[in-house]
């Protein structure tokens, strides 16, 4: 308190000192004898009367007046600022039209985080749930694949299954759309160009395995040597019946007959590329608190920016019944000049014929223990080299998860609550997305007994850094303006999007 009093009293002392230094002319009778006079002072000059101590010209009155003026001006200034910021950038021109806001600069995105594999079998301790340790184990380096047991509790797994059942599941289909066929026609690829694309060994002849390597699906049907030859016979593409097409035979074939044949033949469930049912569960505002908590765990696990994780696809929940499977595929498609990512196409303002899923990471959760089969297979994990043609040797197609799952390099057995995650792209050397990692080829083995439940969290990143930044900026703007329910509207189960993942 003493210090405070001293602080308050200090200006008064200064005022007294300053007042004592004021130079007012004194009447002659009050001047000390011998006092010096300034030029212009004279006895006859009119004498300026002294102000009364409480008069309007006193220093105290002057200080009070200045304080009042400053307070008044401050209030006026504050009022003007309030009006200005309340109206934003409203135009002062008459009329109801609002000035068009200048576009915000697109932010620059930092590098994408990527966990180091170190070596197969390497374990590290992490905390994705407060107060609880989890262990991440490296399963392979090509692709960069990890396993984290106990990521979900048994109760959380059962809840996710329950929520999916309440919403309702639909059959998972992979079918080319009419738009896909129209786009293919619009590209005007000659049959000679198509033949050269399929002819991998450039011997001028199309063997069955060359056709199978590129033509992985028809009307959702998994193509095998048997049904390829059946199609050849139906459309009379192989007159000599040797199962090999020459350039002349291929040129004589009408591709419209091929599409007509595929549309007219309905595939059985065991002949499909995938035999499962699925649904989507959102994880944003308004979702069940467990769903939001899982997203936060994924955020801590991946160490990616919140914007990337939050604006990625909802959680996909999949049920494989007995006999269910998913032949080997990659989760992301390569982006060519003719393609665009599904999630950024709304903001890209580009006209391209094809779209594809751009999934930087896959986080897969096992929601139950499977009685028989149902492993996740990575056929070429940690191979020294990758060659698409080597996937099909003699009668063995490593992509066929119904027949040859046991021949894959790595199989992960479903265990309730365990998560596995991997990167679908190689790094580009500049902290962003590079080429698709061919070693990320994976599939769901045949469920021989019981039912298999899984869930997928896909993290979407556009290989174009600028498009990804624009997408995040636009989604953030929509969220601020209440234009979406915490997430963009995803159209992720379109037939061609799924089909493109397979190509």
Swiss-Prot record:
TM annotation in the entry: 62-82
Cited Gene3D superfamilies: EF-hand, q2cbj1_9rhob like domain
Keywords noted in UniProt: Calcium, Dioxygenase, Endoplasmic reticulum, Glycoprotein, Iron, Membrane, Metal-binding, Oxidoreductase, Repeat, Signal-anchor, Transmembrane, Transmembrane helix, Vitamin C, Zinc, Zinc-finger
Gene Ontology biological process terms from the UniProt entry: regulation of erythrocyte differentiation
Residues binding Fe cation, per UniProt: 329, 331, 375
Sugar-modified residues: 349, 369, 383
UniProt topological domain (Cytoplasmic) ranges: 1-61
Binding positions (Ca(2+) 2): 238, 240, 242, 249
Cofactor note: Binds 1 Fe(2+) ion per subunit.
Residues annotated to bind 2-oxoglutarate: 452
Location of the EF-hand domain: 186-221, 225-260
EC number: 1.14.11.29
Membrane topology qualifier: Single-pass type II membrane protein
Superkingdom assignment: Eukaryota
Signal peptide segment: none
Tissue: Highest expression levels are detected in the eye and brain, especially in the retinal epithelium cells and cortical neurons. Also expressed in skeletal muscle, lung, heart, adrenal gland, kidney, prostate, thyroid and testis.
Residues on Lumenal side: 83-503
Cellular component terms per the entry's GO annotation: endoplasmic reticulum membrane
MF terms (GO), sorted A to Z: 2-oxoglutarate-dependent dioxygenase activity; calcium ion binding; hypoxia-inducible factor-proline dioxygenase activity; iron ion binding; L-ascorbic acid binding; zinc ion binding
Main location, first listed in the record: endoplasmic reticulum
Subunit structure: Homodimer.
Task of the protein: Catalyzes the post-translational formation of 4-hydroxyproline in hypoxia-inducible factor (HIF) alpha proteins. Hydroxylates HIF1A at 'Pro-402' and 'Pro-564'. May function as a cellular oxygen sensor and, under normoxic conditions, may target HIF through the hydroxylation for proteasomal degradation via the von Hippel-Lindau ubiquitination complex.
UniProt name for this protein: Transmembrane prolyl 4-hydroxylase
Organism from which the protein derives: Mus musculus
This protein's encoding gene: P4htm
């Amino acid at each position: 308190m003493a210090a405070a009093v001293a602080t308050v009293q200090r200006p008064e002392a200064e005022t007294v000192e300053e007042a004592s230094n004021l130079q007012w002319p004194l009447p002659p009778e009050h001047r000390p004898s011998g006092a010096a006079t300034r030029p212009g002072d004279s006895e006859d000059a009119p004498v300026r009367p002294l102000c009364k101590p409480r008069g309007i010209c006193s220093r105290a009155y002057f200080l009070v007046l200045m304080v009042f003026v400053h307070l008044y001006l401050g209030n006026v200034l504050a009022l003007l600022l309030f009006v200005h910021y309340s109206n934003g950038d409203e135009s002062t021109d008459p009329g109801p039209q609002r000035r068009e806001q200048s576009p915000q600069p697109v932010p620059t995105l930092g590098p994408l985080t990527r966990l180091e594999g170190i070596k197969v079998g390497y374990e590290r301790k992490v905390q994705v749930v407060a107060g609880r340790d989890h262990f991440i184990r490296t399963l392979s380096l090509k692709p960069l694949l990890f396993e984290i047991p106990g990521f979900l509790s048994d109760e959380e797994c059962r809840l996710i299954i329950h929520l999916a059942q309440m919403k309702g599941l639909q059959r998972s289909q992979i079918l080319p759309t009419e738009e896909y066929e129209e786009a293919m026609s619009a590209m005007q690829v000659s049959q000679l160009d198509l033949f050269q694309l399929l002819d991998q060994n450039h011997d001028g002849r199309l063997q069955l395995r060359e056709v199978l390597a590129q033509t992985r699906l028809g009307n959702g049907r998994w193509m095998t040597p048997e049904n390829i030859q059946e199609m050849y016979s139906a459309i009379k593409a192989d007159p000599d019946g040797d199962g090999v097409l020459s350039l002349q035979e291929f040129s004589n074939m009408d591709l419209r007959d091929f599409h007509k044949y595929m549309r007219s033949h309905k595939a059985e469930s065991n002949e499909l590329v995938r035999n499962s049912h699925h649904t989507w569960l959102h994880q944003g505002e308004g979702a069940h608190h467990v769903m939001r908590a899982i997203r936060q765990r994924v955020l801590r696990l991946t160490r990616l920016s919140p914007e990337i994780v939050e604006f990625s696809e909802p959680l996909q929940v999949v049920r494989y019944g007995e006999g269910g499977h998913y032949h080997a595929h990659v989760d992301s498609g390569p982006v060519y000049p003719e393609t665009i990512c599904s999630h950024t196409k709304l903001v890209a303002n580009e006209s391209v014929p094809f779209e594809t899923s751009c999934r930087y990471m896959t986080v897969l959760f096992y929601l139950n223990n499977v009685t028989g089969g149902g492993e996740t297979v990575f056929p070429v994990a940690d191979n020294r080299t990758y060659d698409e043609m080597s996937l099909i040797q003699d009668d063995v197609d490593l992509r066929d998860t119904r027949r040859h799952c046991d021949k894959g390099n790595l199989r992960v057995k479903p265990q309730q609550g365990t998560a596995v995650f991997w990167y679908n792209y190689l790094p580009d050397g500049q902290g962003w997305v590079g080429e698709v990692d061919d070693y990320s080829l994976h599939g769901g083995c045949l469920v021989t007994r019981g039912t298999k439940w899984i869930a997928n969290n896909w993290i979407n990143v556009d290989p174009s850094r600028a498009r990804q930044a624009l997408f995040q900026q636009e989604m953030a703007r929509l969220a601020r303006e209440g234009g979406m329910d915490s997430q963009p509207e995803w159209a992720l189960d379109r037939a061609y999007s799924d089909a493109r993942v397979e190509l």
